[in-house]
Amino acid sequence: PSSISIYGENIAINNVGISQGNKYVRANGIVSSNESDSLTIELNELPVDYIQDVVNFHSVEFGGRASGRAYVTGINNSTPTLDAYIKVRNMIFEEGRMGNANLHAFWDSEVEGISSKGVMIDEGDIYTGVDGYVSPKNNRIDLLVSTHNTRAEFLNGIIGSIFDDIDGHVNGDL
């Protein structure tokens, strides 16, 4: 069974979640200002576009199904930390198929956003590296994208107003 217990300024969360079929988000841990207390959030097959809606971030569009874990500490203090290991099945970036993503993300107080590093592996020798950050609060994104035979479809979402039906493969850093 699930439970939420409140002790002064601390909140203990035990197996609290929402699910539908194989999709779920689940939380366990303690919410407090103590940095040794943490909250673990588990995701399974959660739609990435839904996550974008929740944080109200649409500077660029992502899609796919996210699964993994995020660890949050010091939620009630001025410098909380977030450390997440996420896999995204059938990742979409700006209308382009990117394959399956393995990402490490963490809260970066310097940019007031989430810094991430990872790789998206498509079929054959197609893969794309990513390193940078997104800041929903400041509506900013700064990503170094390293392409290796990456499908060029994602450029439709970026420069599609200038060029139509971009297809092919891309190599190099963007």
For each predicted feature, which ranges?
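Interface amphipathic segments
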Residues: 1-173
